[in-house]
Design a protein with these regions (language model features):
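Terminal alpha-helical anchor/extension segments at protein ends
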Residues: 1-165
Length: 165
């Protein structure tokens, strides 16, 4: 039997679940909250962008950052969740991972996942399911896991010992 780790996330919160087998129920392992995700961007930083001096002359113009403060806070949160996922992965013996998030956030997770964890991602559900009741979430995740071909999950199985009994 293959146990799965299921990460259900949005910009504000993430929940890590254990799914002991394809037919069992989700068990909550760890919760994460991003307080910056709940606040408007104006509350996270100053109201005006920085100023930059021109090379010659006395002209100045506003400096536009590459990412907004809100996007930066989201990436910091994603890195925090991934660090916890790595710690969990080191202790659970190589369980496959199911990622559940909105498409844009799923891309952020993909971008920041280290190679060792990317190899263990067995399925992705491109929906924001964080607000669903646990029973409905359980149903959706189990449907996705049951739809996986056995060849996908067999590479994560731990070999059984055969010996004299």
């Amino acid at each position: 039997m293959t146990a799965f780790r299921v990460l259900v996330a949005d910009k504000v919160k993430a929940q890590l679940y254990d799914l002991p087998s394809r037919r069992s129920s989700l068990k909550a392992l760890q919760s994460f909250v991003n307080p910056a995700g709940m606040q408007p961007e104006r509350a996270l930083g100053s109201g005006r962008p920085g100023r930059v001096m021109s090379g010659t002359g006395g002209g100045r113009h506003a400096f536009q950052p590459k990412h907004s403060i809100k996007e930066h806070a989201e990436e910091v949160f994603v890195r925090l969740v991934i660090a916890a996922l790595e710690t969990d992965a080191a202790g659970n013996g190589g369980a496959p991972i199911v990622l559940v998030a909105a498409p844009r956030l799923l891309g952020t997770y993909r971008r920041h996942l280290p190679a060792g964890l990317k190899e263990r991602v067995a399925a992705e559900i491109r929906l924001d399911l964080t607000k669903l009741p646990v029973l409905e979430l359980n149903k959706r995740v189990r449907e996705a896991v049951m739809a996986l071909p056995l060849s996908v999950t067999s590479r994560f199985r731990t070999p059984r010992r055969r010996g004299k009994a």
